[in-house]
Amino acid sequence: MVGIESFKVMIAPTWVPDRRNAERMLVATLQSHVSNRLSLPDPAVPGQALAQADTPSLVLDLDVFEANLGLMQQWADRHGLALRPHAKAHKCPEIARRQLALGARGICCQKVSEALPFLDAGIRDIHISNEVVGPAKLALLAQLALRADVSVCVDNMSNLHALAAAVAQVGARITVLVEVDVGQGRCGVTDDHDVLALARAAEAMQGLRFGGLQAYHGAMQHVRSHAERAAMSAQAAIRAAGYASLLRAYGITCERITGGGTGSAEFDAASGVYTELQAGSYAFMDADYGANEWSDTLSFGTSLFLLSTVMSTPAPERVVLDAGLKSTTIECGLPRIQGRPGLVYAAANDEHGVVRVQDGAQAPALGEVLKLVVPHVDPCFNLHDTLVTYRDDTVVGLWPIAARGLSR
C-alpha cells in the first residue's frame, strides 16, 4: 500500500492546486482501511467458562501443571541435582519463569533462535542442548553469549574451531559440553580419544570453557516398560560415568553431566552420575507418555489439552471435530479424547478430526466442546500462538507461545 509521504512525492510535479485535496482523500482512504481491518480476537477471555473458548485452542490446567512442576523440582532437590527444564517442550517464557521460581537452575533450548524470546523475558542461564553448525547460527550464538550465561554441545573438532572463531570475533565467552552418545544413536561421540581431544581443545581455545558432558538418551523416554527404562537408564549412566572418569584421569574437571528426560528422570536422578536433569514434558504429559508404565515414586498428571468443537454430525457413528493436522501432530499416534469413553479420534485431516462413536457410546452434539490429549507435546506447542490457562474449567489467562516457529 502506498504511504502518505510516498503519495506526496508522486503527485508533487503536477496538480499542485489539488495536492491538499488529494492528500485529504488519501488519508481518508487509509483511515477507512484501518478502521475496516479485521483482527483475530483472543481465543478466550479471563473469567469465562473454558467451554466458551474459541477452538482449536491449546489449554493448560494450572492445578495439575503446578503439581507437576513441584513434583519434579522436589525429586531433583531430593537427589542433589539441578533441574534444567527443556523449553523446547513448550516454547513459552511464562512457563519457564514458573519453573525458575521453584528452583530450576536454568533452561535448555534446542535451537539458538528458540532461546531469543527467553532472553527477552530475562532468563540468563541457557543451555543449547544441540550442536550449532553454520556461520549465521554461530554468529547468533556468539551474540547470545554476550547477553547470557550460555553453554552449547559439540561433537566435532571442526565445529569447535568454528565456534571459537565466532565467539572470539565479538569477545564473547561460552561453555562447551562435549556430547557423548550413551545409546541414542543420534549425535555425540563414542570414542574415548575424541572425548578427550574435544575437552582438551575446548580448554585451550580463547573464549571457550570446557564445562562437562551432554549425555542424553531420548529413545528410552518412551519405552513402555518401567523395568526396561530402568535398565536402559542404568546402561546410559554407566557410559556417561565412564567418559567422566576418563576425563578426570587426565586431570580434566567434569563439572556437569547433563541429560535425562521425563521418562527416565526417576532412574537418572537416583544413578548418582548426572548433575542436572533436562526433562520438559513432565509439566504437561501427552498421550505417548501416558502409554508408559509409571511407578508410584514419580508420576505426573495430564495438564495440557487441545480444545476442539464438534463441527459436523454426518452419521450416528461419526462426528467431525475442528482440530486436525494443523492443530496437532500425529507422529506419535492420534489424539485421545479425555473423559469420553467410546469416542475414538480415528483420522486427522488438515482441519478436520474424524471421531468414531463406538456402540453404546453417546455421540456429542453439534457445537459441543471436547478435550483432546495431544500425542506429542513439543511439536503441538509449535503449532499454536497462545496457551489458554484455566482452573476449575474457568479461564485464568493467556500466555504467548513466543518461541513457536523458531527452529533456526
Regions found by a protein language model. Give the residues of each.
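Glycine-rich tight-turn/loop motif centered on a GG-T
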Residues: 50-62, 124-128, 142-152, 224-234, ...
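Active-site-proximal beta-alpha core segment in soluble small-molecule metabolic enzymes
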Residues: 86-222
